[in-house]
Structures are given as C-alpha cells and as structure tokens.
Amino acid sequence: MNSKTGAVDPSTHAESPAALACADTPAMGCVAVEARESAAARAQLNRLMVELQDVRKQRDEAFRALEQAHQETLFRLARAAEHKDGETGAHMQRVGAFAAMIAEAMGCPPDYCEILYKAAQMHDIGKIGIHESILRKSGPLTSDEWRLMREHPRIGASILAGSEAPVLQLAAEVSMAHHEHFSGAGYPQGLVGEAIPLSGRIVALADFFDTLSIDRCYRKAHPDAKILEMIRERRGQQFDPRVVDAFFAILDRLVLAREAINAAEEIADVTESDGDWCLIF
C-alpha cells in the first residue's frame, strides 16, 4: 500500500485480479471490488454444490435401480427353482408371510420382519442347481441323490452371496440355515441351538408348516392336525422352542394368511413390496 496515495502497489500483488483492479482506486473502492468478486465466487461455489448434489442424486437413483434389478433377477431365479420342484410362487409367498409374522410375534423390529418377508421367499433358490430327476422323484432318494439334495442350501447361499443389499444378505443366511435343526442334527453345517441364525430357525418352521400342507410328487398333503402334532413333537429337537411358541400364539392368523394367498394365488411380486407387509396379512 502506498502510504501517500492509499493505492495498492501492483508489484507486490501482481497475482491478484482484485489488486490489479484496485491499483489506482481509493481504499473504499478497492474493498467494493473485492466484495463483488467474493460474492461472485460464492455464487459459483453454490452453483457447483447444486450440480454436485444433482450428480449424487442421479448416481444414487441409478444405484437403487441396479440393486432393484439385481434383487428382481434373483427373485425370478428363486421362482424358477420353485417351478422346477413342481411348486408355484404361492409357496414362496406363504413361507415369506409366515416367517415375517412369526418374527413379529417374537418381538423382532418391523424393519427386520419386512426384510425377512422378502428374504424368506428365496430360501430354496439353491434348488436351481439340483436336477429335476431328483427334485421330482416319486420314490425314496438314493444315498448319492440325497447327498446332492443336501447341497442346495450351499448352492443358494453362493448364488446370493456378495451383495451389499440387506435383503440379499439375509436371504443368503436363510438359504444356508433353513435346514439346520435346533438339536444339531440338520444340514449342511450341523449347527446347534442359537448358533443357527434366527432367520434360519424361523424359516425352518415356516417352510415345514407350508410344505407338509401341500401335495408333493412323493407324498400327499398332511392335514393340519397332523402337521401341528409333528411340530409339537419336534419342539426343542428340530425347531427352536421360542419359534414354536410364537408360531402357536398366532396360528389363527397364519391360517388366514395362507387362505388369503391361496385365494389370490399370488398377491404381488416381492419386488413390489415397499413396506407394511403386515397390512396385507
């Protein structure tokens, strides 16, 4: 600054546009120039921030669309596995509904119940890797055939593994654990008690209740009275006692849900369910 004129010395601020503009300007005028440039810089920064937010929004929307497409593809694959086994999508929906309702009765958070409703429907996705001659065999399986059949939980878990989506992570857990027994006599890992993930313990009972109530190529459907007797007998052995108790506490609701799904055949795609599943059942 020149002590006599009050002007900025250009030689000491050569890199500053504001300084150059103010070289022959009184001090108050220099401040005004700098204020205008500062306001312009802030406005440009604000525009850049808005543009960045738009880019992030577009990225997030694209990611959600990709994740949704991935989930839908796997859900369709699970349906293909059901059809391969002679089932329809209604079995998947019933198991999903039963599992979510049992989880709710056990005091699980609503978000968990909603995710489980979707994840449980993919419990048998691994059957896509089992030959139809085994899945639809009318007689007893040979030891080799049974060994192959017991691999479907691992196959399903491997198909579903690696996703960051909570529903697919839980579906992988369900696939691997839904044939474990509380006593440790199940497969594929022989887990015991609470070492079995809760999702697997719940879906094990939901699947058992539904599967025995429908005709299969190797047996006729059991009446409900017989199925309920079997569940009571297997409490603490095949099934977690807490899960069994929750099941019987809401048995009337489960039966109504089954009737609703059967009547409609299919209520909706799991991919279209965005919450409040409990309002459906």
Which role does the model predict for each range below?
Residues 69-72:
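Active-site-adjacent bridging/hinge elements
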Residues 2-13, 17, 22, 36, ...:
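Metal-dependent catalytic cores of enzymes that make or break cyclic nucleotides
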Residues 4, 27-29:
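Generic short amphipathic/hydrophobic targeting helices enriched at N-termini
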